[in-house]
Regions:
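Extreme N-terminal segment that seeds HTH/winged-HTH DNA-binding domains in transcriptional regulators
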Residues: 1-35, 41, 90-120
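Terminal helix-turn-helix DNA-binding modules in bacterial transcription factors
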Residues: 81-89
Length: 121
């Protein structure tokens, strides 16, 4: 599992971690039933608090990406893409909120921002 976090980002570390794990599930890097590192091991590997990994794992479980087995840890869930579509849309919306905020800071109008999105899409 390859995870890179940016401590200077405005996005909280637990959200960055959740997005990274979610993306690896969606692209097939992490497979259904695969065990994730323990919260403590992952926290140590990433030099973050256990609270960060705990929140990320719990959020991902709530969203249907992971499930927990008492005394064994967290595992990749059998992801139903229709079921998680709402979660993915919310994630996109959150990222676009950040982009809109940045655009407003430099007085970029909605049309120009839309053009950038069209170009990237």
């Amino acid at each position: 599992m390859n995870i890179f976090l940016n401590a200077s980002s405005a996005v909280p570390l637990y959200e960055q971690l959740s997005e990274s794990i979610k993306n690896q599930i969606l692209d097939g890097t992490l497979k259904r039933g695969q065990a994730l590192p323990s919260m403590r091991a992952l926290a140590a590997a990433l030099s973050v608090s256990v609270i960060t990994t705990k929140r990320s794992y719990e959020d991902l479980a709530r969203e249907g990406f992971l499930y927990s087995v008492p005394t064994q840890g967290y595992f990749v869930a059998d992801v139903n893409f229709k079921k998680i579509e709402k979660s993915i849309k919310k994630s996109i919306e959150e990222k676009l909120k950040g982009a809109c905020y940045q655009a407003k800071k430099i007085n970029l109008n909605a049309e120009d921002l839309s053009e950038i999105i069209r170009r990237l899409y």
